[in-house]
From Swiss-Prot:
Cellular compartment(s): Cell inner membrane
UniProt main location, coarse: membrane
GO cellular component terms attached to this protein's record: plasma membrane
Membrane topology, record value: Peripheral membrane protein
Keyword presence, Methyltransferase: no
Catalytic reaction list: a quinone + NADH + 5 H(+)(in) = a quinol + NAD(+) + 4 H(+)(out)
Job of this protein: NDH-1 shuttles electrons from NADH, via FMN and iron-sulfur (Fe-S) centers, to quinones in the respiratory chain. The immediate electron acceptor for the enzyme in this species is believed to be ubiquinone. Couples the redox reaction to proton translocation (for every two electrons transferred, four hydrogen ions are translocated across the cytoplasmic membrane), and thus conserves the redox energy in a proton gradient.
Record organism: Acidithiobacillus ferrooxidans (strain ATCC 53993 / BNL-5-31)
Molecular function (Gene Ontology), one example: quinone binding
Record-listed E.C. numbers: 7.1.1.-
Similarity comment: family membership: Belongs to the complex I 49 kDa subunit family.
Classification via NCBIfam families: NuoD, PRK06075.1
Record note on quaternary structure: NDH-1 is composed of 14 different subunits. Subunits NuoB, C, D, E, F, and G constitute the peripheral sector of the complex.
Protein name per Swiss-Prot or TrEMBL: NADH-quinone oxidoreductase subunit D
Amino acid sequence: MPEINNFTMNFGPQHPSAHGVLRLVLELDGEVIERADPHIGLLHRATEKLAENKTYLQNLPYMDRLDYVSMLCNEHAYCLAVEKLLGVEVPVRAQYIRTLFDEITRILNHLLWLGAYALDVGAMSVFLYCFREREDLMDVYEAVSGARMHAAYYRPGGVYRDLPAQMPQYQPSPYRDARRLQELNANRQGSMLDFIEDFARRFPTYVDEYETLLTDNRIWKQRTVGIGVVGPERAIQLGFTGPMLRSSGVAWDLRRTQPYAAYADLDFDIPVGKTGDCYDRYLVRVAEMRQSNRIIVQCVDWLRKNPGPVITDDFKIAAPSREEMKTSMEALIHHFKLFSEGMAVPAGEVYAAVEAPKGEFGIYMISDGANKPYRMKIRAPGFPHLAAMDEMARGHMIADVVAILSTMDIVFGEIDR
């Protein structure tokens, strides 16, 4: 009898469903996957090594470029690590602003994930719906930091500035008439908090629209139910965190188990799945968007009632205001020293983690007392998820690789670092 050999093929890195620069070497028996071998490193930028040659403040923008869909959550973990080493107390208002933007970031991430996942499986409409809502949240990013993605808004000791009193409006353009301009600016007449509150009021109906399109869709369920199943014990062994772990039935969320920022004072639920398949991971993330919206409403309510400082008043850690620099020589010296030499951080080692949209994003920082980290290790949540690709895909059809890969919510900025 002739010997039958398995067929080996490349999936990516140019494949549109490869989520960036993933190269999967698949071993196939017909259309059934016998082995899936992820090859990483095509987006490696030596972030951890670069951090050793930059001051603590200069390192902050690198965090945005790791998981470039969950920008401010990465910054939050970095700031928590530096603040632990410094022993600095963050003002309560800054903690609520961080919590607010962490949840805005979570919704941004899950909207992109849902749109891309649906597109990968073959449902195009959802992608267009999701980007409609992302636009409003990107405008919030831009209003507070000047950038739609890489915000660099958090600082060790607080946040760069308070929330603006006026939400920026669309300007007249030859490409839109006066009536359209009026429609676009209808909910931008007040402050940023007014705009976010208006969005939070509308958002649950948008999530209902996504669920109408997908949750009971027969084709969607055929592509996701029973695909890539991981049980609770195995998920823990593989190092899963975030929605990947919770969809397997493990109620582990750092916002509850190890609260940081203002999460201990807020009311929200932790969505948990049952079977640990692709469909459960979809349901958990959709439920998380609803819970994030609940948290946003509570943060907006608190921030309205409680004005106050948004960054520490220690000028050796945080820069003085521009007004002070123009009137005080000492403030100008502090500013110059902080941005030229940086701050000397006490020697020690810490680990700080946040519940990022993809899972536990952690920073392990070692300081030798200088103005630069001695070593910074980044714990990317997507890395152990991708490592389980072989186990999750084995025995499935080649078309299911796309569904399994998309359900992990892979971003290679953080995996390759």
